[in-house]
Amino acid sequence: MQNEPLTPGYHGFPARDSQGNQEPTTTPDAMVQPFTTIPFPPPPQNGIPTEYGVPHTQDYAGQTGEHNLTLYGSTQAHGEQSSNSPSTQNGSLTTEGGAQTDGQQSQTQSSENSESKSTPKRLHVSNIPFRFRDPDLRQMFGQFGKILDVEIIFNERGSKGFGFVTFENSADADRAREKLHGTVVEGRKIEVNNATARVMTNKKMVTPYANGWKLSPVVGAVYGPELYAASSFQADVSLGNDAAVPLSGRGGINTYIPLISLPLVPGFPYPTAATTAAAFRGAHLRGRGRTVYGAVRAVPPTAIPAYPGVVYQDGFYGADLYGGYAAYRYAQPATATAATAAAAAAAAYSDGYGRVYTADPYHALAPAASYGVGAVASLYRGGYSRFAPY
């Protein structure tokens, strides 16, 4: 009664061998011993070929089938079922191992494909020869891969000595950077680096007035200093130092600009309000304060024997307005007439660099309010500008 459940199992093993099973008869010792010698399968790693993964899965699968047979096989039915289990388990585990390695290979191939189809990369090339043009730069970098775009930066004087090369593949761009960085081309050591995006700031123009004015009174005082020097207009003297200049804005809107309160220099021939404001009106609204300033400064004022040296001793406007006075005001006698002083002022009327303005047609006595944009631009591009870089 004690061993009756196990008796069919023990008698069933020889019968199973007689059916053609090739597996050896297992003993209780064989049931326990193989577990201590079975190595644990290594974890899956990317890039391991199929031959490394399949043999381990086969050995482990076969041993697993034997132990499943001895441990859980108690009847003939279980024995028959387990007799077919090693092959099925071997096949299933082999297919799983093959699928796993195939998945790993496909994963590595997909990663390589994605790497080869990466985003374009832009290189910054500096210190290139000035005679280089886009085809020259494309020929120099074209040996490393497909180039999408080549651009050399120019200004009005020619090449600035640097440019950009955009590769379709970032790997080609890195290889070109490693090979060409530091090489000498026509005596110049070129530098190839990864291009970085420039941070662009949007500068918005501030419009301080609701009627569309873009030139503030402070800037207007720079371009038309005669208008803002003081409350010096003959028509506004009766109003005191807090006078205002009425200027017609857009749409017929009158705008009053308060004048800067400065003390009047006695005896100085300030321009009248009618002529100066008439020349200033309209041109100021169109941003042409420079032309009005040139029209006002072209008229040499009358000579003053005791001219006070307190007005506009600045290096820029002082040289244009009053540069001539310093040359002759001390040399003239106290009884000098207005005609001789005006002639001396016209002869010495220069900007301090030896260039006389009398020969310039834009500095004539004609009103300058009707000049076009081209003429205004020519004033800035003239030979007398001290701020021209070259």
Curated annotation (Swiss-Prot):
It is found in: Nucleus; Cytoplasm. GO terms for cellular component: cytoplasm; nucleoplasm; nucleus. Its main location: nucleus. GO terms for molecular function: DNA-binding transcription factor binding; mRNA binding; RNA binding; transcription corepressor activity. Keywords: Cytoplasm, Methylation, mRNA processing, mRNA splicing, Nucleus, Phosphoprotein, RNA-binding. Residues 18-28, 65-95 have a biased composition (Polar residues). The modification Omega-N-methylarginine is found at R281, R381, R386. CDD domains: RRM_FOX1_like. The record marks R122, F130, R131, N155, K160, F164, R188, R198 as: Interaction with RNA. It comes from the Eukaryota. One of its GO terms (biological process) is estrogen receptor signaling pathway. The modification Asymmetric dimethylarginine is found at R297, R329, R381, R386. Residues 121-197 form the RRM domain. Residues 1-127 are annotated as: Disordered. Residues 97-117 have a biased composition (Low complexity). RNA-binding protein that regulates alternative splicing events by binding to 5'-UGCAUGU-3' elements. Prevents binding of U2AF2 to the 3'-splice site. Regulates alternative splicing of tissue-specific exons and of differentially spliced exons during erythropoiesis. RNA-binding protein that seems to act as a coregulatory factor of ER-alpha. Together with RNA binding proteins RBPMS and MBNL1/2, activates vascular smooth muscle cells alternative splicing events. PANTHER family: ATAXIN 2-BINDING PROTEIN 1-RELATED, RNA BINDING PROTEIN FOX-1 HOMOLOG 2. Interacts with ER-alpha N-terminal activation domain. Interacts with RBPMS; the interaction allows cooperative assembly of stable cell-specific alternative splicing regulatory complexes. This is RNA binding protein fox-1 homolog 2.
